[in-house]
Amino acid sequence: MKKISVVIKEAVENAFISLGYDKKYGMVSISNRPDLCQYQCNGAMAAVKEYKKAPLVIACEVADKLQLSEEGKIFEKIEAVKPGFINLTLKDEFLADYVNEMGGNDNFGYEAEGNPRKIVIDYGGPNVAKPLHIGHLRSAIIGESIKRTERFAGNEVIGDVHLGDWGLQMGLIITELKHRNPELVYFDESFTGEYPSEAPFTMGELEEIYPAASARSKEDEEYKNEALHATALLQSGNRGYLALWNHILSVSVADLKKNYENLNVSFDLWKKESDAQPFIPDMVEKMKADGFAHTSEGALVVDVAREDDKKEVPPCIILKSDGASLYSTTDLATIVERVKLFNPTDILYVVDKRQEMHFEQVFRTAKKTGIAPEELNLTFLGFGTMNGKDGKPFKTREGGVMRLERLIAEITEEVEAKMADREMDEETKHTVARQVGLAALKYGDLSNQAGKDYIFDLDRFASFEGNTGPYIQYTVVRIRSILDKFIAEKGITKAELDKFFADKKLVKSVTESERNLELVIAKFSDMIDLAATEFAPHKVCAYIYEAANCFSAFYHENHILTEQDEARKYSLLKLSYITEKIIVKCLDLLGIDAPERM
């Protein structure tokens, strides 16, 4: 099914072409003056230079030609106005038919254009042995939403958590364990048997061990050197240390999966930094052999600065002077691994925007050295900071970094308090409060452009009014309530609604609110294209907020269930039904559930 913007654009383009003008001037956009028209074409003004005619003359010619064409029959009004705009208003019959067809189509008539892309999305990025905190929130929920939207748009998507499991943090944990429990078999160099399958620690203990080790290493130089030595032994294949490392991984990953599941976030791959290590030696040797890597102050580097750089871009360090690898080394080796395993068209990194320079160096190195094929798109999607009301990074009341599960619990409690007077049992109330709380948290984040910092305001995010997740969910509940009453009235089941509406048509709109709702619904496919192309979940949020507002006006202006004209009543109900399905799909693209009750 053609996008509505394409249907309109093609009609206008053909009018330009038939008059001898280039079709590029037939571009159409949604009107920024909805009081005057629904769509507009500004191409006549752009065509002035090429055709040496007044813009209004060109606009009038095109408007007249469009008026007489077969394609122009979709318009109620075509008007050329000064200085050269072409204002377009669709016929109500066309709009109703278009939305009606959407309702009967898979994916609401959305069809992807061009060849599907294969996209690897790197998001999440937690370190093992540490709890998820609010710093991990944005990467997880932005990445999850992009993954879902890209899949809906017809692309093949591989989501990778990319765990931090290699480096000094492992050495610190192993050293602290050795100090506390030197009798553990993992530290007995003469041991040659099978190591225990059960980890000698719980996740709770691990979470206490790492900060203790990290703090001690900053004050005790000997302890830090011991941790560095333990890291080197691990990375060179010490049996006992590798067994401990595997325990750390299994305990951490089990806990991480549980926490991500609570966020409604999932990954196709649980790859780790360590998985890229085998690719490093050959990668480094090739960089040297090809003349890209050279020694500078003892370190191995690749120069990536360009003459047109507006700011200094330092060389990318591949190996430190002691031969140790860095994050840049691992990230480059991970690109090697991903190209080898998946041959993607795109690799998207959803990470803190403060890492922009790091990824600029990595991307330039990957392209310069041929690690990344020329046609591979490497994209950095840097997200801003979630701040408290004081404008500083969000903290607990005690001033520490808040754990993600605590944040979710606090939001759930806040929503549950707002729902105190609801007539539902306590278990249902808690389940719904959790769904609504997560919607408040996710929508509050995703409705902002990813790159911008935003203020975390629990009262506002959890409100059932305004541009919030709970308001969108409430709109769905309201529509379902209307449909439930109709189901009871007709004596049919929910499962039979699709079949019932299949042969019912939307009739020409009578009210302004009805028309406005249809216009928003009709834009669905255009919105999906935009959100997928720009990796922009906030576009989905803006769309469903507009749809929810339009439905609210529609609900108040039209007597949906008491309409006396049967054809019109079924039309109003079917429009409500299509609206509900589209909002629920959009919520799903954001990783948000739609509760049955609120």
Task: Please identify what each model-predicted range represents.
Residues D97-M102:
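Short, charged, solvent-exposed linker or helix-capping segments at domain edges/interfaces
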Residues M1-A96, E113-M598:
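Non-catalytic interaction-recognition regions
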Residues G104-E113:
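Flexible, low-complexity linker/hinge segments
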